[in-house]
Amino acid sequence: MTASKTKKSKSKKKKNVTKKVNKINKPDIEKITVNIGVGEAGERLKKAESVIEDITGQKPIETLSKTTNKDWGLRKRMPIGCKVTLRGKRATEFLKNALETRENKVADYSFDEEGNLSFGIPDHTLFKSQKYNPDIGIFGMDISITMKKPGYRIKHRRIQKRKIPSRHKIKKEETKEFFTKTFNVEVIE
């Protein structure tokens, strides 16, 4: 009897338990794609390539048209734009500068259901490192941020490729939370 009384007499202490965050559920930036669509080949495209290389510090590749459109004077596989893919430290540094041009504000509709973020910058001279040059002109750009979680490798690997289960996919709300905490982004509804 004394043993049962001592067990009952011990009071359970409530611990201040903080919710543990599973590291495999923490989203991160996989890549940032910066695109300038010029719509034509030639000198204007070369100027756009020099602008994007100056801003990102990386050499761009040309994007090609997929179809022929006689009204616009396009042929299939004709160079019509340029893009750069940034990863790692370069990506985060560029993203800080790009968000600074938008005053750290992003619209809610810029986030998609898979947790990615896309927005545009109407004028490349909004970057602090750029000044207006009448010989080059003004170029706008599209910025797409692709998000990932640890374990996303299974959808890209060659052997035993798998789909990401829905419970592990990045949700729109997780991405918003990531950008507000990491980059102090204000999401405008």
Q: Where is each model-derived feature located?
A:
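Ribosome-associated RNA-binding proteins
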Residues: T2-E189
